[in-house]
Each structure stands twice: as C-alpha cells, then as structure tokens.
Amino acid sequence: TGVFSERGIKAALAGLAPYIFEPERLAYGLERLREIAHRGGITTIGDMGIGGYLGLDRELELLRGAFENDATSFRLFLVSSPWGLPAGMDQKLIRDFATRSTSRVRTGKHVKLLADGGFFAQNMRMNFPGYTDGHQGKWMMEPDELMSAARSYWNDGYQVHVHVNGDEGMDVTLNVLATLLEEQPRPDHRFTLHHVGY
C-alpha cells in the first residue's frame, strides 16, 4: 500500500489506465456527460488541462468522437497542459493542438500551467509560518520552470492559465505575471488563476 499525489498520477496510471480508460467505460462516461449537460441547459463546457492522461491527439480524438455530432447541443472548449506530454515536444504539440478547432470541439491559444499542489492534500505551498506540522507542500512546476514555460507561451500570444493554491504559490505566480508584463506588455492578456485555495 502507499499514497500517491499530484504528479504521482503518472506512476499510478500505468496500472490504473486499462481499467479507467477501458473503451466501453469511457464511452459510457462521455455519454453521461452529454446527458447531464443537456439536462442542465449547458451551452459550453470546458476541460482545463487536456493531454495529461492519454496525450493531446488521443484525448482530442475521443472527445470529437463523442461530441462532434448532431446529438450534442453544447460546445466543448479544451485547454492543453504540458504536464503529461513528452519533454521537449510539449510546445510543438500544444501549438499544433491550438489550430485544431471544429464547430463543437474548440481549441485555441490557451495553456494551463501548474504552480503548487492541491489544498485538499495539503500540497499547496505556504509562506511562513506554513503548515503546523512543518511539511512544505509541493511544487507542481518549480518556480523557474513555471517562469520559463509561461514566458514561452506568453511571448507567443497564448492566454496563460495557472493552477495555484497556497500563498507562496500565489506569490510566485503573481511575480511571473509581473515579470511577463514588464518584459512584454499585453493589455488584454487574461492571465487566469485557477483554484486559489488560500
């Protein structure tokens, strides 16, 4: 027995993927998603981090197969994330992915990056005094890695979304934004913070 969290999902997926992504189970789940969206009158749904489980191409193919048809009355907006993509290939794959919109399954120049960990698992990064038991939380992307990735996409005109929870994670993320605005101002950048747990 053991525990995995955050990026540990990569190791766990090796054993879980055949069950979780079994084709009939996946098709059933996507059909249920369509039913729920229809019942709720939802016109647009989104996936803020596609590509991390099966890869951008496979996930896009699955979603198009499920929703690019007349039985679907909503749009699906997909934002790619480099965290599960092959190192060194992520930017090329994401840039290609951004051009692959269809009428119902939309892509675009958006990317989701990950600063610190989740709040439920107490993996968000906290400033002093931090956690009462002394643990530190986790970086999903080290601050310099976050800066480098954000700069690359920002300079290419992407809207940058960042998963951030703790106040230390927030400080790092806001410093990234301040640096980007100083280096290459963009008045309508729409830099977006996701979750903001603390």
Identify the residue ranges that each predicted region occupies.
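Active-site-proximal loop/turn and secondary-structure-junction residues that shape catalytic pockets
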Residues: I50-Y53, S80-G84, G166-E168, G197-Y198
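Conserved helix-loop functional segments at active or binding sites
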Residues: S152, N175-E183
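Histidine/acidic-residue-rich catalytic or RNA/ligand-binding cores of hydrolases
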Residues: D57-L60, M170-A178
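Short, hinge-like loop/turn segments at secondary-structure boundaries
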Residues: L63-R64, I94-R95, A178-L181
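Phosphate/diphosphate-binding loops
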Residues: E68-V111, R190-G197
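Short acidic/histidine-rich active-site segments
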Residues: Y158-E168
